[in-house]
Amino acid sequence: MEVKDIFSYDWSYLLPEFIILGFATFLSLLDLFAGKRLGKQVIGWLSFLGTVIAAIFVIINMNALNKPYSYMIDMIRIDDYGNAFKLIFLAGTAFAILISLSYLKAGEVQHRGEYYYLLLTGLLGAMVMASSADLITLFVGLELLSLSSYVLVGLRKKSRLSNESAFKYVVSGSIATAVLLFGMSYVYGLAGTTHIYEISFRLAEAGMAGYQFLVYTAFAFLAVGLAFKISAAPNHMWAPDVYQGAPTPVTVFLAVVSKAAGFALIFRVMMISFFNVSDGTGSGRFFFEEGSLYLGLMAAASMIIGNTMALRQTNVKRMMAYSGIAQAGYLLVPFVPPTSLFFSEVIFYLFGYLLVSFGAFAVIMVVSREQETEDLKGFAGLYHRSPVMAIAMSIFLLSLAGIPITVGFFGKFYLFMGTLVVENYWLAAIMIITSVISYYYYFGIIRQMYMRPGTTEAPMVVPKGIWTFILIMAIATVFFGAFPGLVTDYIQIHFNPSFDFGNMLSPSSQ
């Protein structure tokens, strides 16, 4: 690519990334030279403003984009799929910033300025991952998100638990990155290119040439490495310790934004790269046979391990970590194998999970701060101290359990119906059984709030900002549970969810 080619691109489609990069750079300099005079709250609100402006430009791109647009020999691809995930990332980061504005007032994080622009750099990494069409840019985005997350988890420097969780996160993440890179090296060795859309055809040729075992090995290593990002089995063991030790806004950032970024990677790397590979007999495709079976086993293991291990937890954040492992299993179900509507199912589920997770963790943050404990007993008698908080938390838990009428019910319902369409009855059965198991620990929290006496009857003092945020999340959870068509129709209109699996050509060749 020549220098003149750089100026021939329409760079407006990358404005959301440029805005986040610009705000992160500007805020780091502002914190360095004027942080004490301005105050850290100003930096927080400016970070929030940056995410809102970037989201506006993503929406503008959605309306202006008629077909995928690529940059730098297809290294970056702007398309409906990437834009949908970017909106999830931006909303998740904006919500994390909003609850952080209240959380960080207590001084639990010493370097509050760094905290906000580290969130933005992590967001930028996730956005790059969503638009990557090349293994190099994909890995750069992955590391940008990962390194930012490592630092965010350990920002409570005076907390032994936070330091321990950060150390475990770095070690586990480094191992997962090494495994992922090992899988990428196999892919590059077989394909001779790092362009994901070209890899799809090169791997098919390698499989037909007798290198199927190496192709399958590459798939296995990539799957194990990506399992870390979405906290799915067999690479899930870091999640409970990290969720417990990290600041609560960082915990929910990892639970939503980092997990969603991992699923964006699964599509870009796993589905596209291995889409055209034969299953060895010439009668089918590897991804729809052996590859889907592998992901199905990951999904089943995640649902079973996550829900059964959550039964034993007394710490609410650890319980939510195991719940998140189970949610990763549910989200893997549409990929086993994918149908033409898998995109709608994944995005709708992530949308509902976004609302419910941020609402639930906001309540956990308020209760744990007032009670000075994150144990279940801290929720005892919550209904008598703050009926609104108790009702809101009940709504979030019912949604996670998949109870009508909540957004979580329809999220699981769409996933379940998708499994029936492709006749994955064994996976549908595991979904039902593990969902029933989850009722026990979700209703355990509800039982504490309504049926157990608390240590005090004094009304709970909830900051107005966080109170409003929780109330909005609760209303949205019920509203979109009652009218799910508003979201699904929007997805179908703006994001072309009926993905044409037979058209896997790179943008330049379409």
UniProtKB/Swiss-Prot annotation:
Keywords linked to the UniProt accession: Cell membrane, Membrane, NAD, Quinone, Translocase, Transmembrane, Transmembrane helix, Transport
Gene label: nuoN
Protein name as annotated: NADH-quinone oxidoreductase subunit N
GO cellular component annotations of the record: plasma membrane
Subcellular location: Cell membrane
Main location: membrane
Chain segments annotated as transmembrane: 14-34, 42-62, 84-104, 113-133, 135-155, 170-190, 208-228, 247-267, 286-306, 323-343, 346-366, 390-410, 426-446, 466-486
Subunit structure: NDH-1 is composed of 14 different subunits. Subunits NuoA, H, J, K, L, M, N constitute the membrane sector of the complex.
Catalytic activity: a quinone + NADH + 5 H(+)(in) = a quinol + NAD(+) + 4 H(+)(out)
Coiled-coil ranges from the UniProt annotation: none
Family annotation (NCBIfam families): NDH_I_N (TIGR01770), PRK05777.2-4 (NF004446)
Organism of derivation: Brevibacillus brevis (strain 47 / JCM 6285 / NBRC 100599)
Database matches in Pfam families: Proton_antipo_M
E.C. code: 7.1.1.-
UniProt keyword Cell inner membrane present: no
Function of the protein: NDH-1 shuttles electrons from NADH, via FMN and iron-sulfur (Fe-S) centers, to quinones in the respiratory chain. The immediate electron acceptor for the enzyme in this species is believed to be a menaquinone. Couples the redox reaction to proton translocation (for every two electrons transferred, four hydrogen ions are translocated across the cytoplasmic membrane), and thus conserves the redox energy in a proton gradient.
Topology relative to the membrane: Multi-pass membrane protein
